[in-house]
Amino acid sequence: MTLQDIADQLGYSKNTISLALRNSPQIPQGTKEKIQRAASQLGYRPNAIVSRLMAELRSSQKSKFQAKLALLNANDDPNAFTSHPTIPIYVEGCHRRANQLGYSFDSFWIQDTAMTAKRLIQIFKTRNIKGLVVVGLMGGNQLPSRLNSLWESFPVVVTGVRTRNPTLSFACVDHHMLTLRAVERLIELGYKRPALVLDDSIDLLVERRFSAGFKTGQVRLEDQNRIPPFLKYKQAKADPRIFKSWILDSKPDVVLTLYNSVSTWIQELGWQVPEDIGFAQLERRPESPQFAGMDQHNDIAGEAAVDMVISQIHNNESGIPKFPRATLIGATWTGSKSILSPLTDVPAAKPSA
């Protein structure tokens, strides 16, 4: 079945059929749907090799920068792209992949209430911006509702978390597998009472995938060694007695967390890391090489987001998707001196009250 066969069947030109099957905006939506439906019923399948060669040909005929993309800072901090401990890693990956593919980025802070959707759309069209990558959403999983028309007008992908209202395609680390693998690794090293220390708001942001992965890993432990997650980081930061009471009562032999400050809390109680208790990071960073833990590879999530949005551009896809897509990045364990490896008969720490 060829394009000409479909054209003969439907009474359109071959060029119209080709544009409709590529979802071109030049063809009315009703006509596109009619042609796409008929092509599917007739058994048409595009030749993958020819499609790739044509894409390469079109690419080679364009200038060095095919088009611009917008990198949208969704964080409350307008300087988060440089000042935040995590967000710059996503940004680095976004820029690296965009440059590899011949695109460049313009950056915008979308929490500026003076910047309306209408104004942004006007700017993006003036600058020939074709797609949007959202970075830095940390305080919740909802984007500003005042920008709804923006998400309807462009290809858009979110990094770091999955959003709701609107629900958009996203790329991020696999939070469930990240925590599960960390627990499994600690058990392999001989730890028997791992504990998870987080803030409830962070666990909620990722729809409980941190605690779910942790609890899944605990299945391998004896019932009496399954310590419930401690999700009161913010409260404990304000009142250290909360953490002290919990850790004395729970008696973990290793702590998993996102916060380096928890290591300080432990040492202030008179515990030695790793001699008395192990310490592992769920987001290991280059500036803290002394901590063992999981490398999230958030730069790769940034790269994946760029790949996804460029795919949307090539396929003429825009707006809030009916079926949002996800790319999950695998995390890897890196050992360091905060964990005893291999663990040899080290009891849970017993600090003085």
Say what each PLM segment does.
Residues 1-58, 353:
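N-terminal helix-turn-helix DNA-binding module of bacterial transcription factors
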Residues 4, 42-121, 130, 200:
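Amphipathic helical "hinge" segments at domain boundaries
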Residues 70-71, 128-137, 157, 195-198, ...:
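Periplasmic-binding protein-like
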Residues 98-111, 166, 194-197, 208-240, ...:
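Short beta-strand elements in bilobed, periplasmic/extracellular small-molecule ligand-binding domains
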Residues 135-178, 279-292:
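Flexible loop/hinge segments that line or gate small-molecule binding clefts
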Residues 169-196, 237-244, 296-317:
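Hydrophobic alpha-helical segments within soluble ligand-binding/sensing domains
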Residues 182-221, 319-340:
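An alpha-beta-alpha
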Residues 245-353:
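Flexible loop/turn connectors
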